[in-house]
């Protein structure tokens, strides 16, 4: 009977998630029909909570652990509270971004509860903390006016944060990633990436001339080199490609992007010959079976899990996800694919794609250049993180140690991603608010007038001299007229 319930539930879950994913993209068909959009958002929430219920029902049936029921109810209360508060205070927030955030949190809670109830419980505590940030940040962004002026504060705090890990950080799997304070471990690079985006956005907002680009590139290189020195190659790639995308969009010069890609290729070639851990990862990527007992073990187990799970998976609780090293973090997509099915995993990736499209669309709509660059940078961080995680788990690219946002286990990753989503919502609210748009337009006009006055002031000595030279003959003419009279 239990086996029948598990098998039936996995097909129901896949069908529900297929419908949810279809609705994510079907929404783009109705950009100017708010009633139709609202109906689709409500349908999404309905299917989302059915998936959540289905997953925890299976987990309870397979374990008969009553703690799972209480845990499910606590999650349900939290997720409903998120909707109630957002609808109460942030009426102009993006419903799709909100739905997708909660959907991915639901999936995270299901798969982490399956892997380890203790880890799921700890992750839930971080979700509670992240929810507070997600509520406060849109309000702060609406009230704050100093974000574009803190350029060197972003750079200084970010570099110090990364240097602290390099100097006193705790090494994990050959890389220095975190700072430990008693039982609490923090990964600063997860938060510094937000400061990194704000630094580049504020620099590009001021100017995109050669001097400004050179300074931006130099400081960005410091961020990346510190990560390389810490052996955090995934973080270094994430930061570098984010920088590359933002610079390319700001300058619209393709040779910069092409040069950046060539630089990455040269860096990988040099790293292969200089660093053993880089060589091991590349060998494990090219031929994992040849080093299955060593560097290739993780990738092989991930591929075995994805392959044996097939399109429909074994069902929650029926696979062997704990055979995959670091399954709750780097290889979470392999565990999802094994038990929930390849179709479910692809749907999850497409939900991530819809999030990026919404963020990119927001960037295109923002009239304020600073926030346009911020939205683009945060969207790039999110998309690249998904690409690096999924690509590493499927042998598309070498493993980088990057986690899947909102789904993988890890407090720092979860909090930073919820902060990013809170910022995206804040920009959606700013963009949708007529009053805020008017203030931004007024500020942009005043800034433009100030720049024009500064240019006129720079030319003023020459202008005054010419005016005086013009006035002298006129003055002489008047005096001569008086004399003649």
Where are these regions (language model features)?
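Select subsegments of transmembrane alpha-helices in polytopic membrane proteins
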Residues: 42-48
């Amino acid at each position: 009977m239990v086996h029948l319930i598990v098998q039936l539930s996995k097909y129901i879950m896949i069908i529900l998630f297929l419908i949810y994913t279809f609705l994510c993209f079907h929404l783009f068909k109705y950009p100017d029909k708010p009633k139709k959009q609202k109906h689709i958002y409500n349908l999404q929430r309905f299917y989302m909570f059915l998936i959540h219920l289905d997953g925890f029902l299976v987990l309870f049936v397979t374990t008969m652990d009553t703690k799972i029921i209480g845990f499910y109810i606590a999650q349900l209360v939290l997720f409903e509270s998120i909707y109630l508060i957002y609808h109460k205070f942030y009426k102009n927030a993006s419903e799709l971004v909100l739905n997708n955030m909660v959907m991915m949190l639901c999936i995270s809670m299901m798969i982490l509860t399956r892997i380890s109830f203790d880890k799921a419980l700890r992750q839930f505590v971080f979700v509670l903390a992240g929810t507070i940030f997600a509520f406060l940040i849109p309000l702060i962004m609406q009230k704050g006016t100093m974000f574009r002026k803190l350029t060197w504060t972003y750079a200084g705090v970010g570099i110090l944060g990364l240097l602290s890990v390099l100097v006193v950080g705790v090494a994990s799997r050959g890389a220095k990633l975190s700072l430990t304070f008693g039982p609490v471990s923090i990964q600063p690079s997860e938060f510094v990436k937000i400061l990194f985006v704000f630094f580049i956005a504020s620099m590009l907002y001021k100017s995109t001339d050669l001097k400004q680009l050179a300074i931006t590139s130099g400081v960005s290189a410091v961020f990346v080199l510190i990560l390389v020195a810490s052996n955090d190659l995934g973080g270094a790639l994430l930061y570098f490609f984010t920088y590359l995308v933002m610079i390319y969009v700001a300058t619209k010069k393709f040779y910069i992007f092409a040069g950046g890609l060539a630089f990455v290729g040269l860096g990988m070639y040099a790293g292969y010959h200089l660093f053993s851990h880089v060589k091991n990862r590349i060998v494990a990527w090219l031929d994992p079976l040849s080093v299955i007992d060593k560097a290739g073990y993780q990738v092989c187990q991930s591929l075995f899990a994805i392959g044996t799970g097939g399109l429909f998976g074994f069902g929650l609780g029926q696979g062997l996800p704990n055979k995959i090293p670091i399954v709750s973090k780097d290889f979470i997509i392999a565990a999802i694919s094994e038990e929930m099915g390849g179709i479910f995993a692809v749907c999850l990736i497409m939900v991530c794609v819809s999030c990026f499209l919404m963020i990119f669309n927001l960037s295109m709509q923002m009239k304020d250049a600073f926030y346009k660059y911020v939205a683009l940078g945060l969207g790039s961080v999110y998309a690249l993180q998904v690409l690096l995680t999924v690509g590493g788990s499927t042998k598309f690219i070498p493993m980088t140690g990057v986690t899947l946002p909102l789904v993988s286990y890890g407090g720092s990753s979860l909090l930073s991603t919820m902060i990013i989503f809170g910022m995206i919502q804040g920009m959606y609210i700013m963009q949708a608010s007529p009053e805020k748009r008017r203030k931004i337009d007024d500020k942009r006009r005043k800034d433009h007038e100030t720049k024009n006055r500064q240019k006129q002031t720079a030319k003023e000595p020459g202008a005054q001299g010419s005016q005086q030279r013009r006035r002298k003959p006129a003055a002489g003419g008047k005096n001569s007229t008086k004399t003649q009279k």
